[in-house]
């Protein structure tokens, strides 16, 4: 798993990119939360933290533009799920969102990454798992609500769930950038992904 330093470790030039683009990068530590407000663990309120508390703190302490049109959210792996989860459910807060190698459908992986601590065991809590996966949140948005970029490596174990998300977005006629490139669930892949996401968000901010 990653932590608050992961992006800078993957992309040491991130501070220079921030200066060049005039972008503030805020990197919270999501632990193993999947960025949910956990129905099983009341101590885990990461959706509230990221979409409300952290946004208010950042706007109150840094020279931000406090508007959804100047705010984007992205992440890798669990964070890719978290970014889309947060933006789709809080499109009043974020104007753009991205996922790199995101676990956008958690249900094929019921024994992985301590998700059962947040949602309960899959077999006994299928409805909760269905309700807490990104691919089942798309009814909350229509085309134009969010600028979306989604990418995943062709050797990544999350590739198929990302293709499914892409097809569901197409079926709903929701515009999005969808990229697959050679690579796996690795830092080398994400180092390049960050470049694409920053470019995408920079163009969004300048609209």
Which residue ranges define each predicted feature?
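Non-catalytic cap/lid and distal C-terminal segments of serine-dependent acyl enzymes
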Residues: 1-207
């Amino acid at each position: 798993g990653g932590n608050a330093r992961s992006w800078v470790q993957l992309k040491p030039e991130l501070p220079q990119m921030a200066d060049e683009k005039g972008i503030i990068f805020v990197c919270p530590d999501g632990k193993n939360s999947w960025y949910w407000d956990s129905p099983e663990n009341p101590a885990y309120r990461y959706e509230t933290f990221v979409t409300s508390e952290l946004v208010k703190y950042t706007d109150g302490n840094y020279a931000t533009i406090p508007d959804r049109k100047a705010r984007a959210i992205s992440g890798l792996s669990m964070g890719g799920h978290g970014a889309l989860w947060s933006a789709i459910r809080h499109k009043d807060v974020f104007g753009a969102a991205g996922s790199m190698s995101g676990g956008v459908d958690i249900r094929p992986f019921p024994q992985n990454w301590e998700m059962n601590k947040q949602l309960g065991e899959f077999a006994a809590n299928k409805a909760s798992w269905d309700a807490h996966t990104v691919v089942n949140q798309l009814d909350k948005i229509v085309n134009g609500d969010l600028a979306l970029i989604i990418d995943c490596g062709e050797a990544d174990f999350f590739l198929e769930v990302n293709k499914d998300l892409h097809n569901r977005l197409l079926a709903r006629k929701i515009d999005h950038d969808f990229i697959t490139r050679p690579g796996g669930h690795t830092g080398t892949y994400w180092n390049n992904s960050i470049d694409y996401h920053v470019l995408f968000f920079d163009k969004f901010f300048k609209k």
